[in-house]
Amino acid sequence: MHFIFIILSLSFVVNADVFPSSVTLSSNDFDTIIKWDNNVISYDVELMQYSHDEWRTVCTNSLGYCNLTNSDIDNDDETWVRFKYENKTSNEHNIGRVCEIVQITSPIVNMTRDGSIILLDIHHPMTYDNQYYIYNNITLCGFEFIYEATFIINDTIIPYSIDNQYCDDVHCLFYFISQEPVCVYVMGMEQYYEFGPKKTDNSTRVCVDGLIPRKIDTYFIKDFDDIDRVNNRLYRVVSDKYESNISSKFMHLYNNILSSFKLILQELMVNTEQ
């Protein structure tokens, strides 16, 4: 009798512990993984998202974790998982949204000097496989970072926010003038995401040497490349800040003015070089 009781008790314990009790969701640059606490039994893993309302198998015979990276999930959707083992199905586990928990690595930063003009080039963070930029991409949560730059000039720390008017879907180009040695590191910040602020890691620190010898600069446009840079800057400021409030006729006129401005500058520079 005691032997039968022991067998029944052991059977109850095995059934009670057959499924994980703790399930977590992690994502690094959208390499997204579910992990659980039972690493003894292999499970089939099923997933359901709020907008689809149906269960589908995302992993089979998985031990300890299930990689969702190639499972075509909606990163901004509430998500549930459950486990299957033999003919049994676990309770459902709400694991939240990828957009809430994703950790994003640092932007790639380069800085170059051309005389007194310094170019800070900030490349947006990319997905774990270097396939997609994590910036203004609706399938990757739509994060639109403002880059918080920390400049170090002559041992003085100067914080500066790089507005997204300097940015496109690949990188941000920020020009400024300094003859001093300059170092900088950058962090991306999404202030207005609905589930709270989202930060990237800090970038590596990059530097440019000071200008030797020092000189007096009295003008900003020095060669043909500068003309395109100034034109692009003017166009981006106007289109980003005002395009939604002005007519297409005005934008057409504005583009004509920019083109004329470029032709005038080119003519002046050609005459100056002769």
Curated annotation (Swiss-Prot):
<dbReference type="Pfam" id="PF20634">
    <property type="entry name" value="IFNGR1_transm"/>
</dbReference>
<dbReference type="GO" id="GO:0060333">
    <property type="term" value="P:type II interferon-mediated signaling pathway"/>
</dbReference>
<comment type="similarity">
    <text>Belongs to the type II cytokine receptor family.</text>
</comment>
<dbReference type="InterPro" id="IPR036116">
    <property type="entry name" value="FN3_sf"/>
</dbReference>
<protein>
    <recommendedName>
        <fullName>Uncharacterized protein C6</fullName>
    </recommendedName>
</protein>
<dbReference type="InterPro" id="IPR021126">
    <property type="entry name" value="IFN_gamma_rc_D2_pox/mammal"/>
</dbReference>
<dbReference type="InterPro" id="IPR013783">
    <property type="entry name" value="Ig-like_fold"/>
</dbReference>
<dbReference type="GO" id="GO:0004896">
    <property type="term" value="F:cytokine receptor activity"/>
</dbReference>
<dbReference type="Pfam" id="PF07140">
    <property type="entry name" value="IFNGR1_D2"/>
</dbReference>
